[in-house]
């Protein structure tokens, strides 16, 4: 069966025969972007990538748990605790007044007193960093969930909320300054990282 060439002045669909219905673009658009659109499972193999098996229910459950606001807050709390503890020990290590007794300024502090002071400062910094990290992370996740977008505004809003909540312990003015300062810092960090 040889294909016949279309007549001069005729189009290819007409040459193929009148048995085929013309393509209705409005109907096609309904299935692609309209009301009849259905979610598609995009397999990496069909897109030119390495094919992978479908995810099991356990994998989906673990992904949902790791993407939850509670998990992100706990992760930021633990990370803040470790980072704050290291920062506190570092600052205590370079401070010349560690273990210093104001009652007896000429006495050299013992290693036990210096280590005790370093541990106290490290624990204090660790707790503060953990609280700030958990507050900021949880607030940012909740703002992102509420807005439905992931952009720089989320970190600015959550920075303002976190800074304001921390600052309001010292008064309204301190809360406003904390809100503005933490929001500006969050915006600068987000601008630098993105």
From Swiss-Prot:
Its predominant location is mitochondrion
Q: Which cysteines are joined by disulfide bonds?
A: 69-141, 160-179
The post-translation modification note in this UniProt entry reads: Disulfide bonds promote efficient assembly of the TIM22 complex.
UniProt keyword annotations, A-Z: Disulfide bond, Membrane, Mitochondrion, Mitochondrion inner membrane, Protein transport, Translocation, Transmembrane, Transmembrane helix, Transport
Q: Where are the transmembrane segments?
A: 74-94, 123-143, 170-190
The source's domain of life comes to Eukaryota
Would you name any one GO CC term?
Answer: TIM22 mitochondrial import inner membrane insertion complex
Q: Where in the cell is it found?
A: Mitochondrion inner membrane
Q: How does it sit in the membrane?
A: Multi-pass membrane protein
Any one GO biological process: protein insertion into mitochondrial inner membrane
GO molecular function, a single term: protein transporter activity
Q: What role does it play? A: Essential core component of the TIM22 complex, a complex that mediates the import and insertion of multi-pass transmembrane proteins into the mitochondrial inner membrane. In the TIM22 complex, it constitutes the voltage-activated and signal-gated channel. Forms a twin-pore translocase that uses the membrane potential as external driving force in 2 voltage-dependent steps.
Quaternary structure and partners: Component of the TIM22 complex, whose core is composed of TIMM22, associated with peripheral protein FXC1/TIMM10B and the 70 kDa heterohexamer. In most cases, the 70 kDa complex is composed of TIMM9 and TIMM10 (TIMM10A or TIMM10B). A small fraction of the 70 kDa complex is composed of TIMM8 (TIMM8A/DDP1 or TIMM8B/DDP2) and TIMM13. The TIM22 complex also contains AGK and TIMM29. Interacts directly with TIMM9, TIMM10A and FXC1/TIMM10B. Interacts (when oxidized) with TIMM29; interaction is direct.
Instruction: State the similarity comment.
Output: Belongs to the Tim17/Tim22/Tim23 family.
UniProt name for this protein: Mitochondrial import inner membrane translocase subunit Tim22
The scientific name of the source species is: Mus musculus (Mouse)
**Gene (UniProt):** Timm22
């Amino acid at each position: 069966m040889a294909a016949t060439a279309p007549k001069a002045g005729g189009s290819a669909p007409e040459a193929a025969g009148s048995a085929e219905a013309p393509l209705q673009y409005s109907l096609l658009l309904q299935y692609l972007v309209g009301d009849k659109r259905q979610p598609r499972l995009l397999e990496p193999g069909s897109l030119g990538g390495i094919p992978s098996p479908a995810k099991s229910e356990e994998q989906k459950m673990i992904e949902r748990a790791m993407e939850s606001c509670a998990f992100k807050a706990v992760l930021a709390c633990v990370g803040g605790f470790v980072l704050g503890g290291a920062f506190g020990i570092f600052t205590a290590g370079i401070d010349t007044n560690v273990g210093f007794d104001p009652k007896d300024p000429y006495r050299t502090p013992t290693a036990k007193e210096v280590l005790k002071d370093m541990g106290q400062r490290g624990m204090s910094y660790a707790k503060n960093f953990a609280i700030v990290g958990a507050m900021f992370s949880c607030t940012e996740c909740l703002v992102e969930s509420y807005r439905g977008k992931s952009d720089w505004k989320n970190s600015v809003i959550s920075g303002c909320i976190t800074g304001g909540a921390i600052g309001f312990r010292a008064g309204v003015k301190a809360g406003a300054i904390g809100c503005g300062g933490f929001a500006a810092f969050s915006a600068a960090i987000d601008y630098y990282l993105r």
